[in-house]
Every structure is written in structure tokens, then in C-alpha cells.
Amino acid sequence: MFKYTRFEKARIIGARALQIAMGAPVLIDVPEGITPLEAAIMEFEKGVIPITVIRPS
């Protein structure tokens, strides 16, 4: 798995949590009553978030 900086990780999880809160489908099975932020963190840990990071070369 790719190593992200803490800033990249925060941006990815925050953006995905916002998407989930706005109605995007969750890509993993999550328990009932979980918050969008918790769901985004679980997706990040499993490596299934459909967001890419482009770094300058």
C-alpha cells in the first residue's frame, strides 16, 4: 500500500466522509449506525477509497 503523509490522509478521509454524508454509497460492509467519518476511516484502512493523490515529480 502507498504511504501517505498525515496531510494527505486527512484530506482523503475528509473528502470521502463528505461524499458519504452527501449520499455516496459506502464501498464496504459497515455496521448500522456508523458515522460517515468512521465509514471513511474503515474504507481508508482497507484501501478501497476511490481517490488518488498526484504528487509533483
Swiss-Prot record:
Domain of life: Archaea
Source organism of the structure: Pyrococcus abyssi (strain GE5 / Orsay)
Top EC group: transferase
HAMAP family attached to this UniProt entry: RNApol_arch_Rpo6
SUPFAM superfamilies, alphabetized: RPB6/omega subunit-like
GO biological process: transcription by RNA polymerase I; transcription by RNA polymerase II; tRNA transcription by RNA polymerase III
InterPro entries from the UniProt entry: DNA-dir_RNA_polK_14-18kDa_CS, Pol_omega/Rpo6/RPB6, RPB6/omega-like_sf, Rpo6/Rpb6
Matches recorded under NCBIfam families: PRK01099.1-3
Name listed for the protein in its UniProt record: DNA-directed RNA polymerase subunit Rpo6
Family statement drawn from the similarity comment of this UniProt entry: Belongs to the archaeal Rpo6/eukaryotic RPB6 RNA polymerase subunit family.
Reaction equation(s) it catalyzes: RNA(n) + a ribonucleoside 5'-triphosphate = RNA(n+1) + diphosphate
Biological function: DNA-dependent RNA polymerase (RNAP) catalyzes the transcription of DNA into RNA using the four ribonucleoside triphosphates as substrates.
Cellular component GO terms, alphabetical: cytoplasm; DNA-directed RNA polymerase complex
Enzyme Commission numbers on file: 2.7.7.6
Location(s) in or outside the cell: Cytoplasm
Record keyword Transcription present: yes
GO terms of molecular function: DNA binding; DNA-directed RNA polymerase activity
Key words of the record: Cytoplasm, DNA-directed RNA polymerase, Nucleotidyltransferase, Transcription, Transferase
Subunit structure: Part of the RNA polymerase complex.
High-level lineage: Archaea, Methanobacteriati, Methanobacteriota, Thermococci, Thermococcales
